[in-house]
UniProtKB/Swiss-Prot annotation:
GO terms for molecular function: ribose-5-phosphate isomerase activity. This is Ribose-5-phosphate isomerase A. Belongs to the ribose 5-phosphate isomerase family. GO terms for biological process: D-ribose metabolic process; pentose-phosphate shunt, non-oxidative branch. It comes from Photobacterium profundum (strain SS9). One of its GO terms (cellular component) is cytosol. Homodimer. NCBIfam families: PRK00702.1, rpiA. It is an enzyme of class 5 (isomerase).
Length: 219
């Protein structure tokens, strides 16, 4: 089974959590694209989706799935999204696709976070994948210096502007043993919109596409 086939298996497995008449929180990325394609088969049963990015909104609308703004809903039953890394505590690094802030908002208004990944994304310690930080442009140099103090090697992601009009700094060479504490420290820096650590609000369900099929884990 190829990596993309494992992503597809995880994406389709998340359909089990979609309930009739609901509005579904939808993340961003290659694995989520498979979930969106799967969701099309249930589009007559659901009211629609809240999307975490322009890219996902375009894919949903192309398939005829109504998209609501986050401000139009009081809450969501589920949020389905991928991860760049996830550890045994269900803490995640997300934001490789630069949609981390909107992903964090949609996750926050959802009762259950369902993380869909292939088995290469499971790690013992977070940080091998560069940690994305969304930053207001005028704070770029200051935040870079502060991230060095926290033990990282920051790199400006050239040519990338988030859906919110901000920039991304990727932090390399961080072994993150206390994800909640690091999330709090980076989020407290003036000029940071949010960091791509999802630990304060981690995943509740993990669906892992693997060569032998989909492995399911729940908190």
């Amino acid at each position: 089974m190829t990596q993309d086939e494992m992503k597809k298996a995880a994406g389709w497995a998340a359909l089990e959590y979609v309930t009739k008449g609901s509005i579904v929180g939808v993340g961003t990325g290659s694995t989520v694209n498979h979930f969106i394609d799967a969701l099309e088969t249930r589009k007559e049963e659901i009211k629609g989706a809240v999307s975490s990015s322009v890219a996902s909104t375009e894919r949903l609308e192309k398939l005829g799935i109504p998209v609501f703004e986050a401000n139009e809903v009081a809450g969501l039953d589920i949020y389905v999204d991928g991860a760049d890394e996830i550890n045994a505590e269900y803490d995640m690094i997300k934001g490789g696709g630069a949609a981390l802030t909107r992903e964090k908002i949609v996750a926050a208004i959802s009762d259950k976070f369902i993380c869909i990944v292939d088995d290469t994304k499971q790690v013992d310690v977070l940080g091998q994948f560069p940690l994305p930080v969304e930053v207001i442009p005028m704070a770029r140099s200051f935040i870079g210096r502060e991230l060095v103090k926290l033990g990282g090697d920051p790199e400006y992601r050239e040519g990338v502007v988030t859906d919110n009009g901000n920039i991304i700094i990727d932090v390399h060479n961080m072994a993150i043993t206390d994800a909640k504490d690091m999330e709090k420290k980076i989020n407290a820096l003036p000029g940071v919109v949010t960091v791509g650590l999802f630990a304060a609000r981690g995943a509740d369900v993990l669906l892992v596409g693997a060569p032998e099929g989909v492995r399911k884990f729940e908190k």
